[in-house]
Amino acid sequence: MANLGCWMLVLFVATWSDLGLCKKRPKPGGWNTGGSRYPGQGSPGGNRYPPQGGGGWGQPHGGGWGQPHGGGWGQPHGGGWGQPHGGGWGQGGGTHSQWNKPSKPKTNMKHMAGAAAAGAVVGGLGGYMLGSAMSRPIIHFGSDYEDRYYRENMHRYPNQVYYRPMDEYSNQNNFVHDCVNITIKQHTVTTTTKGENFTETDVKMMERVVEQMCITQYERESQAYYQRGSSMVLFSSPPVILLISFLIFLIVG
């Protein structure tokens, strides 16, 4: 882990040092330099954008100053100041027409990632969260009748589980046991209010199905918990702290 942090430090120092030097280089075409920022005004190489159609400065039909049909100052049909048909100031097609539009709200990606990793907290269930939808597992119950019954009725069984954060449990068995109980209870109550009842066979199969889903949920939570712990260890190492401090110095400076 320390070697990885050192290599990251060397790589970012080299990259940001090069960027820092690029920022300090003078840009061509500045004020009082050899290259003119405004074409046609005394550049050593002549006018980069000569008038079209044979018309000189101040002549009609050739982009003249204040004349029609050529992009004149304040005149139509040529992109004039504040006039239509040419992308003028505040008119259609111009880049400045976007100034007065309200900016779109930005989505907080950190909150989205946290909600996706931890699941949605369910109100009224005392801190239980609802996991993401899963495909119902393929289970064999030991008899052709039960296997066929399961295939025909699996759509009536839960495809999401309720659970608490895994750090509230001492082991996987406790997590799975609590997950199975609360999930079957909530699904049974919700379905019963819709006028549908479950038989003993349904309850038996639901227990098997939900148990497999709760085990899968525990494995997902364990992996996410391990990744969060690894990230904390990585960002708390001295090389990474030094790297972040150096990057902040370059950005601010």
Swiss-Prot record:
Cellular compartments annotated: Cell membrane; Golgi apparatus
Effect after changing T183A: In SENF and early-onset dementia; induces loss of glycosylation at N-181
Keyword Zinc: yes
PTM annotation, UniProt: The glycosylation pattern (the amount of mono-, di- and non-glycosylated forms or glycoforms) seems to differ in normal and CJD prion.
PROSITE patterns: PRION_1, PRION_2
Residues that hold Cu(2+) 2 according to the record: H69, G70, G71
Keyword Transferase: no
Spans annotated as Interaction with GRB2, ERI3 and SYN1: 23-230
Major localization listed first in the record, in broad terms: membrane
Glycosylation positions in this chain: N181, N197
Free-text note regarding domains: The normal, monomeric form, PRPN(C), has a mainly alpha-helical structure. Misfolding of this form produces a disease-associated, protease-resistant form, PRPN (Sc), accompanied by a large increase of the beta-sheet content and formation of amyloid fibrils. These fibrils consist of a cross-beta spine, formed by a steric zipper of superposed beta-strands. Disease mutations may favor intermolecular contacts via short beta strands, and may thereby trigger oligomerization.
Function noted in UniProt: Its primary physiological function is unclear. May play a role in neuronal development and synaptic plasticity. May be required for neuronal myelin sheath maintenance. May promote myelin homeostasis through acting as an agonist for ADGRG6 receptor. May play a role in iron uptake and iron homeostasis. Soluble oligomers are toxic to cultured neuroblastoma cells and induce apoptosis (in vitro). Association with GPC1 (via its heparan sulfate chains) targets PRNP to lipid rafts. Also provides Cu(2+) or Zn(2+) for the ascorbate-mediated GPC1 deaminase degradation of its heparan sulfate side chains.
Protein name: Major prion protein
